[in-house]
């Protein structure tokens, strides 16, 4: 619904504008059902007990799409301890993501904040020159109140 609201505003082209990317994740905290919506965004990563899965959308950036219905949500299932990683294209150039998967796998026990910082630092070492954003979410069971 939010995409239907904002898409028309971004269709109004500004000279030199390449389009606006959208990377969104919704999680039902009771069931673990999740949905990822990617419109021109860099790949995201889901770390589960079975390894790391790269999630890449085929949808154009907002403003370049003809209709919001072009955006296809990616259905996911998250369990306790799973990580979801979103990166801006300044961090992930999309060509070689082996280094991202390696960091996420090796550092899965670290805090989400530390994993995000490590991803940005590694991108800087790789010579990334664009703005860099990393968001890492870990799904955890609620701890009982003491």
Task: List where the protein language model places each region.
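Short, glycine- and charge-enriched coil/turn segments that flank and shape catalytic ligand pockets
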Residues: 30-31, 48-52, 105-113
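Amphipathic coiled-coil signal-relay and dimerization helices
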Residues: 34-38, 53-56, 145-146
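Residue-level structural signal for beta-strand termini and adjacent loop
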Residues: 39-40, 57-58, 100
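Residue-level detector of flexible, active-site-proximal loop/helix-junction positions
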Residues: 43, 51, 59, 141
């Amino acid at each position: 619904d939010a995409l239907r609201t904002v898409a028309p505003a971004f269709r109004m082209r500004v000279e030199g504008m390449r389009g606006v990317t959208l990377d969104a994740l919704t999680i039902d905290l009771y069931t673990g059902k999740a949905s990822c919506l990617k419109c021109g965004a860099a790949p995201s990563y889901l770390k589960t007990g079975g390894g790391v899965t790269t999630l890449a959308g085929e949808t154009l950036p907002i403003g370049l799409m003809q209709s919001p219905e072009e955006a296809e949500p990616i259905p996911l299932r998250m369990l306790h301890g799973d990580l979801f990683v979103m990166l801006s294209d300044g961090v992930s150039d999309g060509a070689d993501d082996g280094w991202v998967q390696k960091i996420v796998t090796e550092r899965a026990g670290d805090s989400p904040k530390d994993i995000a910082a490590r991803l940005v630092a590694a991108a800087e070492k790789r010579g990334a020159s664009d703005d860099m954003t990393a968001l890492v979410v870990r799904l955890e069971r609620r701890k009982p109140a003491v």
